[in-house]
A protein has these predicted regions:
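Terminal-region recognition feature
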Residues: 1-187
Length: 187
């Protein structure tokens, strides 16, 4: 008997026709049952965050008649280098508005937009070696001079709102924030 024959693993039936879920499907449904979700991707317009938002909304709707003290929390693990500020803002608003408590747990990295989402949790935890980072972001504008001017005004407004949000959600004072806001500030 050759070494290759010893390593063969027999399969029962055709896995393509099986009624068993794929490993990804199994993990998804098990995590959903356990109310555990992950933001482990770039926060952009790829709709992963929108899909997660839909799930959180649906759970809130399904459990609207359960007394608040009996609600089981949702755990949201974050490992993200960040991304789009608008996407992060809508998701932060949703998390904060959730009737169901949402616990955010930073693992590895929670930077930029990922850091903002981390701050939105009703309770927050971070693994010991997690890197948290905040900065004023970056943007690119195109269009007419007037369109670019309006876009810049809007971006400055968003940065001021982000500053107010961070100051509200942390013990960082305004002087310290202002001193560090123009760089990648690792906390």
């Amino acid at each position: 008997m050759s070494v290759i024959e010893l390593l063969e693993i027999p399969l029962i039936g055709d896995t393509k026709e099986s009624q068993l879920p794929s490993p990804e499907e199994y993990t998804y449904w098990k995590d959903r049952k356990n109310r555990t979700f992950y933001v482990d991707y770039e926060i952009d317009e790829c709709y992963s965050l929108v899909e997660l938002a839909k799930i959180i909304i649906q759970i809130n709707i399904e459990e609207r008649d359960i007394p608040k003290e009996q609600l089981q929390p949702i755990r949201l693990f974050i490992h993200s280098y960040g991304g789009d500020l608008e996407q992060a803002n809508f998701f932060c608003d949703l998390v904060q508005a959730s009737r169901i408590p949402i616990i955010t747990i930073a693992m590895g990295v929670a930077m930029s937009a990922g850091f903002l989402i981390f701050l939105s949790g009703h309770k927050r935890y971070a693994f010991k070696h997690t890197q948290l980072m905040v900065h004023s972001g970056s943007a690119a504008f195109q269009g007419t001079a007037e369109q670019i001017e309006e876009a810049q005004k809007n971006y400055k407004k968003q940065i001021e709102e982000m500053k107010a949000y961070i100051l509200e959600k942390t013990t960082i004072d305004e002087k310290t924030f202002n001193k560090n806001k123009n760089k990648d500030w690792y906390l």
